[in-house]
Curated annotation (Swiss-Prot):
HAMAP family: RuBisCO_L_type1. It catalyses: 2 (2R)-3-phosphoglycerate + 2 H(+) = D-ribulose 1,5-bisphosphate + CO2 + H2O; D-ribulose 1,5-bisphosphate + O2 = 2-phosphoglycolate + (2R)-3-phosphoglycerate + 2 H(+). One of its GO terms (biological process) is photorespiration. This is Ribulose bisphosphate carboxylase large chain. Belongs to the RuBisCO large chain family. Type I subfamily. Mg(2+) binds at residues 192, 194-195. It comes from Caltha palustris. Its cofactor is Mg(2+). Signal peptide: none annotated. RuBisCO catalyzes two reactions: the carboxylation of D-ribulose 1,5-bisphosphate, the primary event in carbon dioxide fixation, as well as the oxidative fragmentation of the pentose substrate in the photorespiration process. Both reactions occur simultaneously and in competition at the same active site.
Length: 466
């Protein structure tokens, strides 16, 4: 009899479909699955597909009212992870209709929702996502993108330079503005609010916005270059966030900033739409990312968070520095840097890219290298990140023995020297130290910076292997 058979049944009967060929419109996910002892990988992979799409733990009579074949996620391929015991990469295909158009929030609620607490799994990590063109086209994406940003700022042929204002908490608005002015006047393109600067008792947001705007207009007038300061619009409510962005627009500044993970994808997407409609660039900080992406066997890899940001919208995003890290990390970081900047990225497992991704007409995002970098790293950073990047030196500017402005001068001189050397055909990987030393001869500021940070190891020799 054709009937409804109650009871608990294996997920793999319905959700493990090795014969399935993914469609162009499917969203594909690569999960690193660590099953509990005794759970076969097919069952674990099928459980992931089920729990992140249409499944529940038992058979329900309402299953008969819909077409599971049309809406279910399918685990279509499983491979063991080399060198790891009891870990598998499970590939899952999700039909297009499972996700609301233009909503990163809804996509994540399904794909990385309840399934991560699932008992049959010891650990679960989302390694990569292939976003189908049909779904990509439902997103606005970055407010402006790389080319429009260069045109707005009138800066071409080199990476952009930034600096996070320190101490990050405790300065008054007036003193904060002074620090901004000194950095911009010395030759930086941007200064940055720290991610934890919102609107605290010692410095309310409106005062900070005013003094920073004054600083950048003064620096612009004196240098003849367009300057920006990332005004952090992150707030406790979406309404307050937009209010801050509106005030920034009224001041006529070029760029605002948002903490996209702590602020949330819904707020971020709203802000990105506002920024495109009102000609503001949007700088994105990734505070909280390590909570999600640090563990190798559980969580979400940063390349997925980076893809999600490109869909939600942002013109800059922090993406690590690569310098002084291991070679493998270098390849993987460059993998998601390409995912941020390029229109079309080929599958390349050696760089951690599990799927070919076509972004069609979504603008690119500038990767921001920030954290523990200084003038000796400049050749490495120029070589690794190329022109389409923002290099941010916080302590590497403000820690200069003579102050902020000379610190900014040192960084700008180092950058211009590296770009010129590269354009003349010199090998930055081999001659990096030499190029910086030569530039020191005609820049006292750079010489002083090099002296301060010379003890900090410059680990770039290994780059020849790339």
């Amino acid at each position: 009899s054709v009937g409804f058979k109650a009871g608990v049944k294996d997920y793999k009967l319905n959700y493990y479909t090795p014969e399935y060929t993914p469609k162009d419109t499917d969203t594909l996910a690569a999960f690193r699955v660590t099953p509990q002892p005794g759970v076969p990988p097919e069952e674990a992979g099928a459980a992931v597909a089920a729990e992140s799409s249409t499944g529940t733990w038992t058979t329900v009579w309402t299953d008969g009212l819909t077409s599971l074949d049309r809406y279910k996620g399918r685990c279509y391929h499983i491979e063991p992870v080399a060198g790891e015991e009891n870990q598998y990469i499970c590939y899952v295909a999700y039909p297009l209709d499972l996700f609301e158009e233009g909503s990163v929030t809804n996509m994540f609620t399904s794909i990385v929702g309840n399934v991560f607490g699932f008992k049959a799994l010891r650990a679960l990590r989302l390694e990569d996502l292939r976003i189908p063109v049909a779904y990509v086209k439902t997103f606005q994406g970055p407010p402006h993108g790389i080319q429009v940003e260069r045109d707005k700022l009138n800066k071409y042929g080199r990476p952009l330079l930034g600096c996070t204002i320190k101490p990050k908490l405790g300065l008054s608005a007036k003193n904060y503005g002074r620090a901004v002015y000194e950095c911009l006047r010395g030759g930086l393109d941007f200064t940055k609010d720290d991610e934890n600067v919102n609107s605290q008792p010692f410095m309310r947001w409106r005062d900070r916005f005013l003094f920073c705007a004054e600083a950048l207009y003064k620096a612009q007038a004196e240098t003849g270059e367009i300057k920006g300061h990332y005004l952090n619009a992150t707030a406790g409510t979406c309404e307050e966030m937009i209010k801050r962005a509106v005030f920034a627009r009224e001041l006529g500044v070029p760029i605002v900033m948002h903490d996209y993970l702590t602020g949330g994808f819904t707020a971020n997407t709203s802000l990105a739409h506002y920024c495109r409609d009102n000609g503001l660039l949007l700088h994105i900080h990734r505070a909280m990312h390590a909570v999600i992406d640090r563990q190798k066997n559980h969580g979400i890899h940063f390349r997925v968070l980076a893809k999600a940001l490109r869909m939600s919208g942002g013109d800059h995003i922090h993406s690590g520095t690569v310098v002084g890290k291991l070679e493998g990390e270098r390849e993987i970081t460059l993998g998601f840097v390409d995912l941020l900047r390029d229109d079309f990225i080929e599958k390349d497992r050696s760089r951690g890219i599990y799927f070919t991704q076509d972004w069609v007409s979504l603008p690119g995002v500038l990767p921001v290298a920030s954290g523990g970098i200084h003038v000796w790293h400049m050749p490495a950073l120029t070589e690794i990140f190329g022109d389409d990047s923002v290099l941010q030196f916080g302590g590497g500017t403000l820690g200069h023995p003579w102050g902020n402005r000379p610190g900014a001068v040192a960084n700008r001189v180092a950058l211009e020297a590296c770009v010129q050397a590269r354009n003349e055909g010199r090998d930055l990987a081999r001659e990096g130290n030499e190029i910086i030393r030569e530039a020191c001869k005609w820049s006292l500021e750079l010489a002083a910076a090099c002296e301060v940070w010379k003890e900090i190891k410059f680990e770039f020799e290994a780059m020849d292997t790339l």
